[in-house]
Structures are given as C-alpha cells and as structure tokens.
Curated annotation (Swiss-Prot):
Name of the protein: General transcription factor IIH subunit 3
One protein family per Pfam: Tfb4
Cross-referenced PANTHER family: GENERAL TRANSCRIPTION FACTOR IIH SUBUNIT 3, TRANSCRIPTION INITIATION FACTOR IIH TFIIH , POLYPEPTIDE 3-RELATED
Coiled-coil segments on the chain, per record: none
Organism field: Dictyostelium discoideum
Residue ranges, annotated region (Disordered): 40-78
Subcellular localization(s) per the UniProt record: Nucleus
Keywords: DNA damage, DNA repair, Metal-binding, Nucleus, Transcription, Transcription regulation, Zinc, Zinc-finger
Origin: domain of life: Eukaryota
Biased amino acid composition, Low complexity: 61-78
Sequence similarity: Belongs to the TFB4 family.
Segments forming C4-type zinc fingers: 323-340
Function, as annotated: Component of the general transcription and DNA repair factor IIH (TFIIH) core complex, which is involved in general and transcription-coupled nucleotide excision repair (NER) of damaged DNA and, when complexed to CAK, in RNA transcription by RNA polymerase II. In NER, TFIIH acts by opening DNA around the lesion to allow the excision of the damaged oligonucleotide and its replacement by a new DNA fragment. In transcription, TFIIH has an essential role in transcription initiation.
Length: 372
C-alpha cells in the first residue's frame, strides 16, 4: 500500500527540469546593438540640425513659424520611431535582466526544480549552468584568492555563490572569438545545443524518472539550412520522448526550424511584439509547466512553415524531388540518389514537359529501379 501511495504522489509531482538554450551569437547581438545605437545617433543628429536651423535668422515671421512647426513635427516623428525601436528590440544586457527575472521566478515555484543553461555560440556549444567539477574547482580557488575581510575580520561572501552570479560570471568568460577555419562563421551551433540538451535530459531522467523536462530556446540568429537534418533528428527525438520545445524568437524574422519543433512537440512558439516587456511574456507564457498547460490557455501557432532543406545544396525548397526509398529531398533531378545510391529513371513525356516549361518543378516524380 505504501508503494502504491508513493507512486501516486510521484505521478502528481510537479518537479520539472528546464533546459534553456541561449543564442549568444556575437554577430546577431552586435548588429542589434549597432542598429539601436544608429537609431539614437540619428535622433541626436536631427535634433542638432533642427536646433542650428532654429538659431539662424530668417526673414518673415510666417516662414519662420512654418519652418519651426515642420522641424517640431519631424522631431516628434523621430522620437516615436526611436521609442518604437526600443520597445520592439532590446540589447543583450537588457535581455539578461529579463532572463534573470524569469529564472528566479522558475526556481521559486518549486525548490526541487532543476535548471540547465546551454550557450549556443559560433561553431560550438557549452554549458553555462550547472558548472562542471573542473570549472567549479577553479572558480572556488579564484574566489578564495579574491575574498576580502570585513571590519570584524570575517570573510565577505562572494557574489558568484548565487545562481545568478554563476550564470553572469560564466557568460562574461565566454570565448566569442571567430575561428577562421569554420565553414559557417556567422552561424550558431543550434543543432549541437539541442543534442546536448537531449543527452542531459536523458541522464537526469535516469536519476529522477518522475521529473518533467522541457526545453526553452531563445533565438536571435537566422536559420542555417545546412543544419536541417541534424535539427530535425533532434526534433523527432524530442517528440518521441514527449519533451516540449518552447521557442522565444527575438529576431525580426520567424524561425522555420523552431516553428516545426514547437508544433511537433506540443510546445509554445512566441515572438514578442514588444521586447521591452519581455519579462511579462516570459512569466505569463513560458513559466507554465506541462501539467498547467492542460488547464490554461497559451499562445498557439496559426500556420507552420513546413518547407524542407534539400540534401544536395542545403537550401530551403518549396517543391523538389523526393527519393521514394530513403525520402531524401533534392532541388533538381539526378540520375541516382546521393544518399542511398538508388538509380532513377524519368519518364520521357515528363522530361519533354520539363524541357518545354523549365520553370515547372514537380515533387516525387521519379520512378525507382530497385537493384535485384
């Protein structure tokens, strides 16, 4: 009887594991900071020019009043544009402030909640929290050297003892230098981050089978079509293990990969309209666990972009050729499948039709000659 009662309690346990994937692409965040600074500098230049214009002497009071009114109207328009850009987009430092509010609220829901943060950088991914044993030992040694005494001769506590201090200290030590031998220099390793997150969840579930895991992705970089296969494998793995993938899009354009991930895994896909209010979006949307989502209403996708990436050139295609054996997708016709090696034969009438109308493409038009 005791075992049955404990099993019921474990099933109703709301302990959750949240694995956060942060997009720390230096180029994407750098372009965001540059655009915000350019908008502010443009506003200052307009104010300087209008002030110099108003200080000059003109003939005719009517003309002077009209010019002043026009300059004031332009300033008001520029101010509205600056305020709109500030509300719609935020920088990395401001994002961390909103993110820390969300993390503290998540940990306050249940003292047994577990947290993991993975940083997706250029060409590699690494854990930000929890720290490894080596990093923790090195940090403790540095803290012992840097700790100071108070007036009573007692050691002062270090700020890195808190979770927030550990996360901020780790983010400050991130190596954001560019490696020239990389093929996709400007792209983040999102597929690697997803793989690390799934492996970490699998290890934690072995230790705590009743824990409820989910993944939250903060994305600001555009999709990389060359990572399509690996990303889709991670999405299907999450779907099979019933791990929701939530997506918070901070970029201007939507993410095709994350739309499919959130839709297939029953996660939440959200693109905040006003990023200045990001804390409210996070607390009211992404703070919901898997049990609460069954009883509460949350944002859902109206339409999902299911376009795939071709296996030959890694480009997003609307219509293409599909191998009926291994389901590989190609943007153009070929004599054989580069994935499984199956030979194709295209019908003559269809080939003539394609030659007469080269702009028309078809999907799954090839017939397969299986080798005996």
């Amino acid at each position: 009887m005791n075992n049955e009662g404990s099993a019921v309690i474990n099933e109703d346990d709301d302990t959750s594991l949240l694995v956060v994937i942060l997009d720390c692409n230096v180029y994407s965040w750098g372009n965001r900071e540059k655009s915000l600074q350019d908008a502010i500098s443009g506003m200052n230049d307009d104010n300087d020019s209008s002030s110099r214009y108003n200080g000059s002497t003109t003939i005719g009071n009517n003309n002077n009043n009209n010019n002043n009114n026009n300059s004031n109207n332009n300033n008001n328009v520029n101010k509205r544009l600056i305020n709109t850009s500030k509300n719609n987009y935020i920088g990395f430092n401001k994002f961390l402030e909103h993110f820390m509010v969300f993390i503290n609220a998540y940990l306050m829901l249940n003292q047994e909640n577990q947290l993991a943060i993975i940083c997706s950088k250029i060409g590699e991914s690494s854990f930000v929290f929890p720290q490894s044993n080596i990093d923790q030992y090195q940090q403790e040694q540095q803290e012992l050297e840097q700790r100071q005494l108070n007036e009573n001769g007692e050691l002062l506590p270090t700020p890195n003892k808190t979770i927030q201090g550990q996360i901020l200290a780790k983010l400050q030590k991130l190596d954001l230098e560019i490696k020239h031998d990389q093929t996709d220099i400007l792209s983040s390793s999102f597929s690697a981050s997803m793989s690390i997150a799934l492996c970490y969840i699998n290890r934690i579930k072995r230790e705590t089978p009743t824990i409820k895991p989910r993944i939250l992705v903060f994305n600001i970089s555009p999709d990389v079509s060359s990572q399509y296969i690996s990303v889709m494998n991670c999405i299907f793995s999450s779907q099979k293990q019933s791990i929701p993938v939530d997506s918070c899009i901070l970029s201007q354009s939507d993410s095709t990969f994350l739309q499919q991930a959130s839709h297939l895994t029953s996660g939440i896909y959200l693109k905040p309209q006003k990023q200045e209010l990001l804390s409210q979006y996070l607390l009211t949307t992404f703070l919901l666990d898997t049990l609460s989502r069954k009883s509460l209403a949350y944002p859902t996708l109206k339409s999902v972009d299911y376009r795939a990436s071709c296996f030959c050139h890694k480009r997003i295609v609307d219509i293409g050729y599909v191998c009926s054996v291994c389901l590989s997708i190609f943007c153009g016709h070929s004599s054989s499948c580069s994935t499984c090696g199956t030979k194709f034969s295209l019908k003559i009438d269809l080939r003539k039709q394609l030659n007469n109308n080269p702009t028309t493409t078809t999907s799954a038009t090839s017939t397969v000659n299986n080798k005996s």
